[in-house]
């Protein structure tokens, strides 16, 4: 996800402490779900560009090397909306779910396949001893969220949380995203209702579209095959853990792009979509962007580029559901709807309003917290509207899907589809990379048509909303 209209960057993970103080460094909780360690390499090898698979049966992290190639530091691979926080506490806040309702028999809470990205948990080593401002996602995560969640649920949803935040608050960001849009509310509600008409409930939808829960061996196999398809074997470290609150976290660690995947929520179809989203879209466009004369803020200003966020997130969101039999845009639609409603409702009103679409209280809590980010007194109407960019970007791309040069759009890096023709003569296209799923453009465009049909999007209506 992208914070601003400039170059998309990944958030740097905090510097690793000295080797002599291992207790100070937060470790990924190892997984014991799948028996003995898959890979016999000890952590002492410190091989770059590896697939890290923690195991409870061995104290050191196991590494499976994709390649021995060394990756140069890529400053363009810092994503501002990705989290670097990996925590084991506060997973649910109301105790463990009973077996059969959100729990894996092997341990760990299963998160729905399309639930929200985690709001980064604040780390003491980030807050203290640093003069730098915290990243947006940390600054906007309430420091007392677990306590307020407990109060909220104990009140039977009658209490409006009173959130506290780490200082300083990013006021310029809050002001930028304080207004919600209603431009695409009809489309958002239409998508949500289409899902519920077909599946009955959100929970049924997740069970049907998420696919089977994957073992470590299956995850590693899928990731390895995907990296081979994209020709980026050896470039991205992949870590498997049971200690993530999110489904996946993209970060830069020791100057290397690192993708951490949550074992307890890794499902077949979600994992494939996540790889197209994170690697096939964000990562490859970032690599291509680093080769272009507009890779810097100054370069973007020189070429007069439009904000890249809607295109970037629209593409990534479309790629998440690409090739699914039923590619519903549920998450983007519900985020858009939730933020619009939050602008006019208190927290408890919003929570109750979402019940018509989502019965799972934990999922509703996540959506409400994201929509109310930055608010102290949530009894007041107000929203943090940034997450509306997903549906906004999706619909803009679908509106112009027949005229967009998708391969060139990817090759030019972090740019809007509106700037492609302007930049065509200036792009450095030598050795740029296009994701494998975009090379057959006929098939790719057919999938976009399938997405239009499945989500009941009307061509004429999009034309009226987004005229040329």
UniProtKB/Swiss-Prot annotation:
Cofactor(s) annotated in UniProt: Zn(2+)
UniProt keyword annotations, A-Z: Carboxypeptidase, Cytoplasm, Cytoskeleton, Hydrolase, Metal-binding, Metalloprotease, Protease, Zinc
Catalytic activity: C-terminal L-alpha-aminoacyl-L-glutamyl-L-glutamyl-L-tyrosyl-[tubulin] + H2O = C-terminal L-alpha-aminoacyl-L-glutamyl-L-glutamyl-[tubulin] + L-tyrosine; C-terminal L-alpha-aminoacyl-L-glutamyl-L-glutamyl-L-phenylalanyl-[tubulin] + H2O = C-terminal L-alpha-aminoacyl-L-glutamyl-L-glutamyl-[tubulin] + L-phenylalanine
Record-annotated active site: 278
Keyword Zinc in record: yes
Cofactor: how bound: Binds 1 zinc ion per subunit.
GO CC field: cytoplasm; microtubule
Binding-site residues for Zn(2+), renumbered to this chain: 277, 282, 313
Ranges of biased composition (kind: Polar residues): 1-10
Domain of life per record: Eukaryota
EC number: 3.4.17.17
Keyword Hydrolase: yes
Residues covered by region (Disordered): 1-39, 77-112
Coiled-coil parts of chain: none
Localisation per UniProt entry: Cytoplasm, Cytoskeleton
A Pfam family that the UniProt record links to this protein: MATCAP
One example GO MF annotation: metallocarboxypeptidase activity
Enzyme class: hydrolase
A biological process from GO: proteolysis
Role summary: Tyrosine carboxypeptidase that removes the C-terminal tyrosine residue of alpha-tubulin, thereby regulating microtubule dynamics and function. Also able to remove the C-terminal phenylalanine residue of alpha-tubulin TUBA8. Recognizes adjacent tubulin dimers along the same protofilament.
Domain text: Metalloprotease with an atypical HExxxH zinc-binding motif instead of HExxH, which interrupts the active site-containing helix without affecting the integrity of the catalytic site arrangement. The N-terminal disordered region enhances its anchoring on microtubules, while dampening processivity on the polymerized substrate.
Family: Belongs to the peptidase MATCAP family.
Protein name: Microtubule-associated tyrosine carboxypeptidase 1
Species assigned in the record: Rattus norvegicus
Taxonomy of the source species: Eukaryota, Metazoa, Chordata, Craniata, Vertebrata
Record gene name: Matcap1
């Amino acid at each position: 996800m992208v914070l601003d209209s400039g170059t998309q960057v990944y958030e740097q993970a905090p510097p690793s402490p000295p080797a002599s103080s291992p207790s100070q460094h937060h470790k990924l909780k190892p997984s014991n779900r799948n028996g003995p360690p898959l890979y016999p390499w000890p952590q002492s090898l410190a091989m770059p560009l590896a697939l890290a698979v923690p195991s409870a049966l061995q104290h050191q992290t196991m590494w499976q090397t994709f390649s021995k190639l060394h990756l140069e530091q890529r400053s363009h691979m810092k994503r501002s909306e990705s989290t670097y926080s990996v925590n084991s506490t506060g997973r649910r806040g109301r105790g463990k779910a009973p077996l059969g309702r959100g729990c894996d028999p092997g341990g760990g809470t299963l998160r729905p396949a399309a639930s929200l990205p985690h709001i980064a948990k604040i780390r003491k080593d980030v807050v203290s001893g640093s003069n730098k401002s915290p990243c947006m996602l940390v600054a906007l995560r309430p420091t007392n969220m677990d306590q307020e969640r407990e109060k909220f649920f104990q009140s039977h949803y009658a209490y409006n949380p009173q959130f506290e935040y780490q200082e300083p608050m990013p006021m310029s960001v809050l002001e930028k995203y304080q207004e919600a849009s209603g431009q695409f509310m009809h489309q958002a509600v239409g998508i949500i209702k289409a899902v519920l008409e077909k599946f009955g409930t959100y929970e049924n939808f997740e069970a049907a579209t998420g696919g089977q829960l994957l073992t470590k061996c299956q995850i590693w196999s899928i990731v390895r095959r995907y990296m081979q398809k994209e020709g980026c074997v050896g470039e991205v470290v992949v870590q498997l853990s049971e200690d993530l609150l999110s489904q996946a976290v993209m970060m830069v660690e020791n100057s290397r792009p690192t993708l951490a995947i949550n074992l307890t929520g890794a499902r077949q179809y979600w994992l494939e979509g996540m790889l197209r989203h994170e690697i096939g879209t964000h990562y490859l466009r970032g690599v291509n962007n680093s080769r272009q004369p507009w890779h810097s803020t100054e370069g973007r200003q020189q070429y007069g580029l439009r904000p890249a966020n809607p295109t970037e997130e629209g593409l990534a969101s479309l790629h998440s559901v690409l090739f699914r039999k039923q590619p519903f845009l549920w998450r983007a639609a519900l985020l858009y709807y939730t933020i619009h409603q939050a602008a006019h409702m208190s927290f408890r009103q919003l929570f109750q309003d979402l019940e018509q679409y989502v019965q799972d209280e934990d999922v509703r809590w996540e959506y409400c917290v994201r929509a109310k980010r930055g608010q102290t007194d949530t009894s007041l109407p107000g929203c943090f509207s940034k997450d509306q960019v997903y549906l906004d970007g999706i619909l803009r791309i679908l509106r112009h899907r027949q005229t967009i040069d998708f391969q060139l759009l990817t090759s030019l890096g972090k740019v809007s589809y509106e700037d492609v023709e302007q930049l065509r003569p200036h792009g450095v296209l030598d050795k740029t990379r296009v994701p494998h799923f975009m090379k057959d453009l006929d098939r790719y465009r057919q999938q976009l048509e399938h997405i239009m049909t499945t989500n009941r999007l009307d061509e004429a209506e999009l034309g009226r909303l987004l005229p040329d």
